Amino acid sequence: MVMFIERGIRGGLSQCSHRHAQANNKYMESYDPSKPSSYLMYYDVNNLYGWAMCQPLPYAEFRWVNDISNFDVNAIALDSSKGYVLEVDLEYPQHLHDAHADLPFCPARDKPPGKRQDKLLATLYDKKRYVIHYRNLQQCTRYGLRIIKVHRVLEFAQSPWLRDYIELNTRFRAAAKNDFEKNLYKLMNNAVFGKTMKNVRNHVDVKLLTKWNGRYGAEAMIAKPNFHSRSIFSENLIAIEMRELEVKFNKPIYVGMCILDISKVYLYEFHHEYMLPSYRDKCKVLYMDTDSLIYHIECEDVYETLKHDIARFDTSDYASNNVYGIPLANKKVPVLMKDENNGAIMTEFVGLRAKMYALKVDGKKVTKKVKGVKTNVIARTITFDDYIQCLEGHIEMTRDQSRIQLLHPEDSKVPRFHRKNIKLRNKKR
């Protein structure tokens, strides 16, 4: 049962669906009326995991359902006292592929072409033995995916037992007067989620020893069958890492798995139930991360639509005298979308891959992101044009990054500079 839940744990989805886009609208100085009016919008969900933690979550009475031949997942209420996680085979019908190309349902871990490491990929392939929460499965079937076979069903008792705690911290955060308080109450929620996701398989046993001989000396530890590795810090100090002899599964990973799955429900709902019906084929996802979406939208005035559907958005950080006439509303309300630019016009976006993109916003510095690279290196050595060159020329650029790190401590007691070569590249399609 534990391994069944582990197979259903999939983190936040991060992908770059379209590589480059430019806005062209009446709020820009470079507006060209001869071209279609278009906007670049960067939406972020307020407290997505906080909202998911307020939903009914498992807490007891776990059991396998014996008779699954007549099991109807669509008959289960969202607030049912019983919840389910299913292992199913899913078919992704061909006629849905074009409509779902920007944001396919049911992301799965797999190796991208030419890569060795598994990544979370949103694909249009059929799914085999896919472990999924019943709410996500209900959403998938509503949008046309077909259940071919149900292999197993795990039943559990559920209730919104975390809701009061999460809502209390949310109220405190909305009333916070400074960034410290805002971050504190955000952490109070996120820390709970982090504990539900703790992987005890990764725990290590490290011993710091100062002697060679004896029952608890370095010699005895190295001779044990569960010895893993050692690092010598000095003549009289050594660290020895031992493999765990037993693993105690005492973390509620079933809660974390359900939170991750339920959180994806809202992002898919926003895209497929709101954005696509509102803009149809004039709207496409450029980039998405765990709780954010960057869109390219062709319309006359996206802010008029936002104003009309303000119940879906948090506009509390807009300027009080903004040119769009949008009222300030819904401050920090969970699971509402927020315009990350707060009305400032995003003029251009370029994305090379997940966690590697850049964007221009009128009146602000260029935003440049490269995962794993220090902020000062990005600011000093990488420009927006570098992203464009990598994209259009299919070239690879490199930069040097230095940090102080203790390398091979058995050879040297003194930390020294470590120079790492980082790459800015675009994968050919």
What is each residue range found by the language model?
Residues 1-429:
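Conserved acidic
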